[in-house]
UniProtKB/Swiss-Prot annotation:
Protein name (database record): Flotillin family inner membrane protein sll1021
Organism encoding this protein: Synechocystis sp. (strain ATCC 27184 / PCC 6803 / Kazusa)
Oligomer and partners: Homooligomerizes.
PANTHER family referenced in this protein's UniProt entry, alphabetically: FLOTILLIN-LIKE PROTEIN 1-RELATED, FLOTILLIN-RELATED
Membrane spanning residue stretches: 60-80
Polar residues: compositionally biased ranges: 664-673
Record keyword Transmembrane present: yes
């Protein structure tokens, strides 16, 4: 920029004729970044014409160049000064090591020095005073001479003395990375301080440490000062801010155990002394208070006696006056009250008489209404009971008649089927021999007698059962009616007596009792109805059971009929009289008795049935009367044809059912088969 300025300045100067201006080359200053070479060349003609003029102006060009060079040198000097010259602050010292030609250490205080990178190294040493707290508490508590453990905070005030030797020692012992920091000083001090504190504490008891903090601080100072000077540090002062007893004792440690014992003894002794002082003080205070209280009470008692005496006199006067006034007022009040009482008694008596009259009239009306309601309810209940009893009897009679009708119809059906079976069998038997016809007649007679006996026994049984049931039901109904009438009569008597005795206070409860009694009466009627229905159901079940017996008999005949049909010819032949046999000896032989004829087990069952006592009796009767074929035909027709309803007149008459003959001795012989 300066070269351009001078170049433009030269161009503005006037040209001299006849002089030649040489070519000038101006190189850019070191500050120019372009490094551009500026060449100023005047026109040949102009330079030649003005050559002499420039020769006269050369001193003017020399001074600016000199000024520029001087300014440039000043700037370079300032730059080098600020770059390589280091000044020590007021609270720091500089230690320069190294050199260009000679290696040496230099301590700079309140000044500066040249530091050339690569040749010199600077260490900054702070001269400020530093406070370092060393805390020993908890598990790190200090043990004293009496084996007690103490928590304490000790503050050390250290610095580096502005002395060449101490500065060089501190720089050599404590510096890191070209400086000495507070952390470096604390690291150098803490362990030395710990040893000094513990050593000084072992020389004093806990109480002495607390009472003589300055002596303890001097002891620590004397112990640590020599070690700190070896590293270039100077200990200015020690401050002990607090000393407290620690509670971190280990009872398994010998020293701690001694301390705990001493601590306990001291504490307990102090507590005892404190308690003694407190008791002594309290006794003295209480004695003084007692004396003062006695004097105060004596004075108060005298005052109270005087006051009481005066109050008694005043009260006696007031009492006399009050009694006189009260007697007068009482007399007046008594007279007024007597008049009021008489008037009130008169009004109350009239009111009571009116209320009694109204209440008696109301009670009479309610009694009449309740009596009529009770009578109506009783009459209605009796009609309902009679109606229910009549309905129950009608229902039972209808059920019994239905059962009897069913029994009669079923018996008629059985008899009709038996007659049809006998008629069909009779047409087959007539083709047999005369001996077989005689046997058939005897069998028919026996069959008729058996059927008649069975029918008679069935009719008698049914009539007896029906008569017993009817008598039982009638007895139950009569008993129910008698009990109901008796209960209603007793109830009426009780209710009338209750209504007469309890007038006003129990009218509501009487109505409730009557309602409950009505409910109980209905419940009794329902219960008796249920009993009557149960008895009727029982009769129906028994009738059904008798019908079931007849049905079971028919099922049995239906089961054995196929076997009986196949063996019927052999049976008739076996039952026929054999020539050469005397008397009425009959030999019955039934094929398959032992179950070996290939017909299975049914043959054995038939033989067992017919060989029983009743079977032999029936068989003998049928043989004597010759009605076996008739019975067989009827049974066959009954089992083959469906049941049909027939009138009772279609049954076999009683003449066809002769009495059964007594059983005769029967001998079985294999030759008669």
């Amino acid at each position: 920029m300066q070269s351009k300025f001078w170049f433009e300045f030269l161009q503005t100067l006037p040209t001299l004729p006849g002089d030649t201006v040489p070519v000038m080359a101006i190189q850019a200053s070191p500050g120019e970044t372009s490094g551009e070479l500026i060449i100023a060349q005047a026109p040949n003609q102009t330079l030649d014409n003005n050559n002499s003029a420039l020769g006269g102006l050369s001193p003017l060009l020399f001074f600016p160049v000199v000024i520029i060079a001087v300014i440039f040198l000043i700037l370079v000097t300032i730059f080098l000064y600020t770059r390589f010259y280091v000044i020590a602050p007021n609270n720091e010292a500089l230690v320069r090591t190294g050199g260009v030609f000679k290696k040496e250490q230099m301590v700079i205080l309140h000044g500066g020095c040249i530091v050339i990178p690569g040749f010199h190294e600077i260490t900054r040493v702070s001269l400020r005073e530093i406070s370092i707290d060393v805390v020993r508490a908890g598990n790190l508590a200090v043990r004293t001479q009496d084996y007690m453990r103490a928590n304490m905070r000790v503050t050390f005030y250290v610095c580096i003395t502005p002395n060449r030797n101490e500065i060089l020692t501190a720089a050599a012992r404590l510096s890191k990375k070209g400086q000495i920091s507070e952390a470096d000083i604390k690291d150098a001090l803490e362990k030395r301080a710990d040893d000094a504190i513990r050593a000084a504490a072992k020389k004093k008891k806990l109480a002495e440490l607390d009472s003589d903090k300055l002596g303890f601080a001097d002891e620590v100072l004397n112990l640590i000062q020599g070690d700190l000077r070896k590293v270039g540090l100077t200990l200015n002062n020690i401050a002990i801010s607090e000393i407290e007893e620690s509670d971190t004792y280990d009872e398994n440690n010998f020293f701690d155990a001694q301390g705990v014992r001493l601590r306990t003894e001291t504490i307990q002794r102090s507590i005892q002394q404190k308690r003694e002082v407190e008791l002594t003080t309290r006794v003295a205070i209480e004695q003084g208070e007692l004396e003062a209280e006695k004097k105060s009470l004596a004075i108060k008692r005298e005052q109270e006696d005087a006051n009481i005496t005066q109050q008694k006199e005043i009260e006696l006067l007031k009492l006399a006056q009050r009694k006189e006034l009260e007697s007068q007022e009482a007399q007046q009040q008594r007279e007024i009250q007597e008049a009021k009482d008489k008037e009130e008694a008169k009004k109350e008596r009239n009111k009571i008489l009116q209320e009694q009259a109204v209440e008696e009239e109301r009670i009479q009306k309610e009694l009449a209404i309740q009596n009529s309601q009770i009578a109506s309810a009783i009459a209605l209940e009796e009609r309902n009971k009679e109606l229910k009893v009549a309905q129950a009897l009608q229902k039972q009679e209808a059920e019994v008649a239905e059962i009897q009708r069913k029994k009669t119809i079923e018996a008629s059906q059985l008899q009709a089927k038996a007659e049809i079976a006998l008629a069909e069998q009779k047409t087959q038997i007539t083709e047999q021999t005369a001996a077989i016809a005689i046997a058939n007649k005897q069998k028919e007679r026996l069959e008729a007698e058996a059927l008649r006996a069975e029918a008679e026994s069935g009719v008698i049984t049914a009539q007896e059962v029906e008569a017993a049931e009817r008598a039982q039901k009638l007895a139950v109904i009569v008993a129910q009616q008698d009990a109901q009438q008796h209960r209603i009569a007793e109830q009426n008597v009780v209710e009338i007596d209750v209504f007469r005795r309890r007038r006003q206070a129990e009218s509501a409860r009487q109505a409730a009792e009557l309602e409950a009694e009505s409910i109980r009466t209905l419940a009794d009627a329902n219960r008796h109805k249920a009993m009557a229905e149960a008895e009727g159901q029982k009769a129906i079940i028994e009738a059904h059971n008798s019908l079931s017996n007849a049905n079971r008999t028919a099922e049995l005949l239906k089961t054995i009929w196929p076997e009986l049909v196949t063996q019927l010819p052999d049976l008739i032949k076996a039952l026929a009289p054999q020539p050469g046999v005397l008397g009425e000896s009959r030999i019955y032989s039934f094929p398959g008795l032992s179950g070996s004829n290939g017909n299975g087990s049914n043959s054995g069952d038939i033989n067992k049935l017919l060989l029983s006592t009743s079977g032999l009796t029936l068989l003998n009767g049928l043989l004597n009367e010759g009605k076996l074929s008739t019975v067989v035909d009827q049974v066959k027709s009954l089992l083959q044809d469906p049941p049909s309803v027939s009138p009772p007149s279609a049954a076999v008459s009683e003449d066809d059912w002769p009495d059964l003959a007594p059983p005769t001795e029967t001998n079985f012989s294999p030759e008669e088969i």
